[in-house]
Swiss-Prot record:
Pfam families (UniProt xref): RabGAP-TBC (PF00566)
Source organism of the structure: Homo sapiens
Residues in coiled coil: none
Superkingdom of the source species: Eukaryota
Ranges of residues in domain Rab-GAP TBC: 101-210
Name the record gives this protein: TBC1 domain family member 28
Amino acid sequence: MEMDEDPDNLPAQGQGNIIITKYEQGHRAGAAVDLGHEQVDVRKYTNNLGIVHEMELPRVSALEVKQRRKESKRTNKWQKMLADWTKYRSTKKLSQRVCKVIPLAVRGRALSLLLDIDKIKSQNPGKYKVMKEKGKRSSRIIHCIQLDVSHTLQKHMMFIQRFGVKQQELCDILVAYSAYNPVSIPGQRYSWYLCPYSQAWVSLGGVATS
């Protein structure tokens, strides 16, 4: 069966198999859905949050420069705190800094420590892989997730490529979580997924392994 066939016109199990296969094969350079993005230097159109705009961005303003310097200082403070996590993990200072929003540059590491991901992963070896394979057998869930993934942060650098690496990871996370928590409804937007997949999986309430 050709992989370009419309999954909506196939039996349920066939739909699920084709969708999963497309994600496993990954992004195809020059695909119609994102050809426009590959023909330009997207760096000129991308802001500091990774969002790709329709028009080339103007030069950075004095206010933005000031904000970035402030963010850099906050990042340095977080790096020092993360380097001595045992000392700061239960302090008021940590709570205050979390409330001010964790800087993007250290957010992944901070979430990993806050959620105690390494401990949870070691206590549940293989759980994520088992749930992912189980979830792949549900065509209904896969089809719902596929619709959501294709609309998640379409203009963000991480998701701009159809069936790209980050779309693959997001699909895997949601497939696994749908198997782990069957009462969840995979019909919401998942724009929060901007951290490593194992952190996203644990933060959803599941358990992961690398």
